Amino acid sequence: GPIWRGGDHGEAAQLASCYRSCLTLALENGCRTVAFPSISTGVYHYPLMQAAHVALKAITDFLRLHPQLSVTMVCHSPQTLHAYQVVWNMLYQETKPHED
């Protein structure tokens, strides 16, 4: 994933491309399920809420075209889970994310 440099250096496009590329490779290799962490939000310092927005939008847009694939977001902290829940609710108020 991209290193955060203030948001004016194409980071969002790079992050979305990262998710799409992984999903495309998964399909090409016959995978049915993919699990993602919150890419670039650790040592690359991508702001969590912005990263969640990019990730969820890129993934859901991809899944609309390829519904045979299943994606799980792995949230390693309560803060990450909260960010993804908030962004999910902002983007898709009519549906709920699946929690295990």
Task: Name each model feature, range by range.
Residues 3-100:
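Phosphate/ribose-phosphate-bearing ligand recognition and processing surfaces
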